[in-house]
Amino acid sequence: MSDLVRSPARAVMVLGTSSGAGKSWLATALCRWYARQGLKVAPFKAQNMSNNARVVPGLIGADGAQPMGEIGSAQYFQALAARCVPGVMHNPVLLKPEADTRSQVVVLGEVRRDLAEVPWRERSEALWPHARAALQQLMAHNDVVVIEGAGSPAEINLHASDYVNMRTALAAQAACLVITDIDRGGAFAHLYGTHQLLPADERALIRGFVLNRFRGDAALLAPGPEQLQALTGVPTIGVLPMWREHGLPEEDGLYEPGGHTAAPGHAAQRLRIAIVAYPRISNLDEFQPLRNLPGVQLVWARQPADLERADWVILPGSKHSQADLAWLRAQRLDAAIARHAAAGGALLGICGGLQMLGEALIDLHGVEGGFDALGGNGPGLGLLPLVTQFDPHKLLRPTRASFGATHGVWAALAGVAFDGYEIHNGRSIQHPAMASALPALRSTCGDTIGWQNGSVLGVYTHGLFESPAVLQALFGAGCRTLDSVFDGLADFAERHFSLGALAGLLSPKQPPG
C-alpha cells in the first residue's frame, strides 16, 4: 500500500536540526497564523515523547461511547491555536518515559501495554499505520495540516524506521521548513548537513530554512544565507530573534541555565517557589503561568540547599511516584521538605506529588513495578494522612473542581472553582486509623480529590495555576490568556518571515528556472 495521503488539503511541516531547535513553538505560531487567514487548520505529530500530556476526547467506540484519551501537551496547545478541538488524532502515538530504557506507549489516547517491550524498530512499523490513518483523517477534513517533526530527520542510524519525520512528510507531500537554533552555534553547518543527509526525494520537500534565537544585527548573517541557498537551492525565509517571553511552555520543561527562572523585568523578587525536579517529573507545562507572574521566582530544586529560602515548595506530577520518591530520599530532600512543612511553609503536592506526601504507597498489581527494581509497597513522606493504592486502570478526565474551607497559608483558595484535568493510576484514601485531614478539593462529581493538613495541601487535579481565579486568589494577579499568547506567536512569525513566505508554503513548489 502506498503511504501517500491523497487529499486536497495542504500540509506544512516543521522539521528541526535537533531537539530544542524551536519546532513546537513555530508549529503553534503557524497554526494560529493560518487559522487567522480563515482556513480550517489542524496540528499533527505522528509520535511525541513527553511526560507533559493533556486529557482530550478519544475515539468513539462501536457502542457509541467516547472515552477520554491523552496527547502531548504541545499538540494540545497547537490545536487550541488552530481553533479546533484537541483530540487523539492530533498526536496518535505518545511515548511517556518511565525509565531510561522504557516508555509507556499510548496509541490514539489509550495505553498499549503490549507494545512497551517491543523493540523500537519493530514497534515503529506497528505504529506507523495508526499515525498514517490519523494523518489521512485530518487531511480529509481540513484546509491545512501543520505537522511537527521530532528531533532531527537526518539521523542516518534511525532513518529507515523513523516515521515521525520524512515518512510523514512524504505521505502528506508537505512543504517542509527546517529550523535551527543559531544561538548554539554551527547553524549553517547543521542546516547544510541535514539537507545533504536526506535522500533526493525528501530534500525536494524542503521549502525553506529558519534561523531561530538570533541575537544582534541580522545584516551580520550575510553572506551565509545566500551561500547556503547556492549550495542547496533552499532559501532562508525566516530569521527569528531571541525571544524568551513568548508565554508558551517549552516542550521538554521549563529548565533554564542556573536552575531558576524569574519573571522578566523584575529584579526584586517577592515570592520564591521551589519545584522539586525529580527525574520522572511530569506535566511541567502547568507551571508556565507562574513563570510569567511579576515578583515570582521559580527554583528547580535538586538538593536541600535549593529549599532553604523557599516560601513555597511544590512536589509536581511524576510518571513513577515510587522511583522519584526514592530519588528524593537519596538527595536528602525528604528531611528538607519535612523541615519546611514543620516551619509552616506552604507545601503543595500535585498528583504524584500528593501520593508522595501520604503515609504509604501500595502497588499490589505491579503498576509501578519493574522499573529500576522499584515497586511494591513503600512509605510516603508522612505529611498527609493518606494511603495510595495503584490501579492498572488509568483515570483520565477533565475536572471541574472547587476548594472547600481551606485555611492557614491556603485560606485564599476557599470557595475557588477551576477547570483542570486528572491523569493517574493511584487512588488515595484517608485511613480511618490515622489523623484526620481536611477534604480540601471536590470535583463536580462529588469525589474528594484534595486534602489539607496544616500548611500541606495535596490535589490530584492538574491545571491549578492555569486558572485565572486561582492566580487572582493566591497572587492578586491575572495571567495572559492563551489566545493572546497564540496571537503573539503568529504576529512574531509574520514580522520575521520573508514577505509572503507563510502564504507561499500553501502553493505548489515552482520548478527552478
From Swiss-Prot:
Q: Which residues form a coiled coil?
A: none
Provide one Gene Ontology biological process annotation.
Answer: cobalamin biosynthetic process
**Record-given protein name:** Cobyric acid synthase
Q: Which family does it belong to?
A: Belongs to the CobB/CobQ family. CobQ subfamily.
**Active-site residue numbers:** C351 (nucleophile), H462
Q: Which InterPro entries match?
A: Class_I_gatase-like, CobQ/CobB/MinD/ParA_Nub-bd_dom, CobQ_GATase1, CobQ_N, CobQ_synth, GATase_3, P-loop_NTPase
State the UniProt keywords alphabetically. Answer: Cobalamin biosynthesis, Glutamine amidotransferase
Q: In which pathway does it act?
A: Cofactor biosynthesis; adenosylcobalamin biosynthesis
Q: Which gene specifies this protein's sequence? A: cobQ
Q: Which SUPFAM superfamilies match?
A: Class I glutamine amidotransferase-like, P-loop containing nucleoside triphosphate hydrolases
Entry keyword annotation includes Chaperone: no
Q: Cite the Gene3D superfamilies for this sequence.
A: 3.40.50.880, P-loop containing nucleotide triphosphate hydrolases
Q: Which Pfam families match?
A: CbiA, GATase_3
Annotated GO molecular function terms are: ABC-type vitamin B12 transporter activity; catalytic activity
Q: Which residue windows are transmembrane per the record? A: none
Q: What does this protein do?
A: Catalyzes amidations at positions B, D, E, and G on adenosylcobyrinic A,C-diamide. NH(2) groups are provided by glutamine, and one molecule of ATP is hydrogenolyzed for each amidation.
Under PANTHER family, the record lists: COBYRIC ACID SYNTHASE, DETHIOBIOTIN SYNTHETASE
Enumerate the spans annotated as GATase cobBQ-type domain: 270-470
